[in-house]
Design a protein with these regions (language model features):
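ATP/NTP phosphate-donor binding region
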Residues: 4-229, 541-542
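C-terminal charged capping/lid subdomain of soluble metabolic enzymes
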Residues: 23, 33-121, 128-133, 314-317, ...
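Solvent-exposed alpha-helices and their adjacent loops that cap or buttress functional pockets
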Residues: 136, 163, 222-225, 248-250, ...
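Glycine-rich beta-strand-to-loop/alpha-helix junction loops that act as flexible
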Residues: 201-203, 233-235, 386-387
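A short, small-residue-rich loop immediately preceding and capping a beta-strand
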Residues: 222-260
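A glycine/threonine-rich phosphate-anchoring loop and its flanking beta-alpha core
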Residues: 244-340
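Active-site segments that bind and position negatively charged phosphate/pyrophosphate groups
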Residues: 334-450
């Protein structure tokens, strides 16, 4: 059986299709992918993954499997690799020969860096090798779970991840630590898992390269290894910065994202685009490094201020406008009650709880369908960038919360789409009305600075490989097209006309608690990462 697990082409697209056709659930497919590295795997983790298969294949025997896996995890050999135990058995010579052969045939099977990635490449050359060409590929796996009460002692989500490893190194948002720090400590203590906790303040003003450097130093001091995922517990800023630190540490260290905010829960958390701000620019530095698992637990939403909840909704609206009409309609029907009840986490209404879950699930599904099919941004047909074309240029200077800046970008994008004839005036107003009904910004005085907005457009064009490729609703709500040309003059004219349109909406299009300082955060326009870029003398040779 072990060899069958090892031989499976678990990272191929065909494997996904055949597994689905065979009736295997998502959790089972994920387990099979990791079991490619079965020989190098701690036996505690091995039997934990086999239990996940048993839940799908032999559910009547699940309890027996769970008890046995728990005994193995806590037993004397729970953290020993399977290959180590096999070499101690009666077939030592057989396994020595097998492992020697696998060093050449399938090195991932016995010496993997982690169970979550696989790579391959083909090299061709001419003559004696003075000209060489190669194609390289990497496959990475991830899981996403929307759940509740993950810190309840009865929950085994974190237990199954970290008990086989014997410890957990966790980066925790200081605000989360204040509200849930003791619960985190108690969970790991109850299950006998050593916890090393690194607590960081993670406000927008902290999102610079210095924070990433500090995280890297703490990882070194904690002795983080590439076979143990770091547990990141926090919101969007921590998802971005700690994710970037994991991408840089050992050039690739896995991490699990336990999302405690809306932005982290359905956008920054599962995103492969880790990043930090620098030189006054939003997300200037970054790397592509998706978490191996994202856990969105709306239990944490209860402690969030209304302003933090509100601005997170923008990332859901963006997916609804360009990807999911049904989600858009659900947001219209449910309205601000989502914010008031913390997405159903703080209400006795079964209907609102169910709606909150439906919204989160639909937003997550739409987001990852768009994101994971273009993991390294090798093209710019990216619907999830709606609202993010011009906003990176004015978010920090204006001191706005990210969601409000995105709201302005989405509203302006809907207006541009209308000018292109891609949507009707009714559809334009419907989009703007939804943004406004969630008290998000359609307008901000910073948009009067058309030169600043055009500069943002030029920078994003550089970032997008020479194309503007601004995603906008096209052909109706729930579908997407891309605007690739907009002159300085047309941009300025559109902004002026858009301002007049915004004045017809509540608050003249202004958002409620639109700025960081209004929701208890420092103003990034004052204390943010605005160190000027030192420009060396450049010699131009013609």
């Amino acid at each position: 059986m072990v060899e069958l697990l090892r031989q499976a082409d678990a990272f191929s697209e065909g494997f996904s299709h055949s597994s689905s056709a065979a009736g295997l659930g998502v959790e089972s497919v994920s387990a099979l992918r990791q079991l490619k590295t079965v020989y190098a795997m701690p036996v505690g983790k091995l039997f934990t993954l086999l239990t996940r298969l048993a839940a799908n294949l032999t559910p009547t025997e699940l309890l027996t499997w769970e008890r046995f896996a728990a005994d193995v995890r806590t037993g004397p050999n729970g953290q020993n690799a399977l290959k180590k135990l096999l070499l101690k058995g009666g077939k030592r010579e057989f396994y020595e020969q097998l492992f020697s052969r696998l060093e050449e045939e399938d090195p991932h099977a016995i010496y993997p860096t982690s169970s979550y990635r696989n790579s391959s490449g083909q090299v061709t050359y001419e003559g004696d090798g003075q000209r060489i060409e190669a194609v390289m590929s990497t496959s990475a796996m991830t899981e996403i779970l929307i759940t509740e009460d993950v810190l309840n002692f009865e929950s085994d989500v974190l237990l199954k991840l970290y008990q086989p490893l014997g410890r957990c190194v966790s980066v925790v948002d200081a605000n989360v630590e204040e509200h849930y720090g003791e619960e985190i400590n108690a969970y790991f203590a109850y299950h006998g898992i050593k916890l090393t906790k690194l607590v960081y303040r993670a406000m927008e003003v902290d999102k610079g390269i210095r924070m990433v450097e500090l995280l890297l130093g703490d990882f070194k001091n904690a002795g983080v290894s590439r076979e143990e995922p770091v547990l990141v517990v926090g919101g969007g800023v921590l998802a971005d910065t700690a994710g970037l630190a994991c991408a840089l540490y050992h050039r690739n260290t896995p991490y699990v994202m336990l999302a405690t905010s809306i932005v982290a829960g359905i956008d920054a958390g599962p995103s492969p685009r880790t990043c930090c701000d620098g030189h006054g620019y939003k997300n200037l530095f970054g790397a592509y490094h998706a978490p191996v698992m994202t856990i969105t637990d709306r239990t944490f939403f209860r402690s969030l201020r209304k302003g933090w909840m509100r601005h997170g909704v923008a990332e859901i609206i963006k997916m609804a406008v360009v990807k999911d009409l049904a989600l858009f309609e659900l947001l219209e029907e449910t309205g601000f009650a989502l914010v008031d009840t913390h997405f159903g986490a703080d209400t006795n209404s079964a209907d609102l709880k169910e709606r909150g879950n439906r919204v989160l699930s639909a937003a997550m599904r739409s987001y990852v369908e768009a994101e994971y099919g273009n993991l390294y941004e090798t093209h710019q047909c990216r619907p999830h960038a709606y609202g993010h074309t011009w906003s990176p240029g004015f978010e920090i200077p204006s001191g706005m919360l990210h969601g409000h800046a995105v709201g302005c970008g989405m509203g302006f994008g809907a207006y541009l789409s209308y000018l292109q004839g891609w949507i009707t005036a009714e559809e334009r107003d419907r989009i703007m009305r939804l943004i406004s009904n969630f008290e998000l910004s359609l307008w901000h005085p910073v948009l009067e600075e058309s030169d600043l907005i055009f500069e943002a457009q030029e920078r994003v064009t550089q970032k997008r490989g020479g194309n503007l490729a601004a995603p906008l609703p096209k052909g109706g709500i729930g579908t997407c097209g891309y605007l690739n040309e907009l002159t300085r003059e047309d941009l300025a004219s559109a902004l002026a006309d858009y301002q007049q349109l915004c004045e017809l909406f509540p608050r003249q299009g202004l958002g409620v608690e639109a700025h960081c300082h209004e929701v208890g955060l420092e103003n990034p326009s004052v204390t943010g990462h605005f160190e000027p870029i030192k420009k060396p003398a450049i010699a131009t040779v013609s």
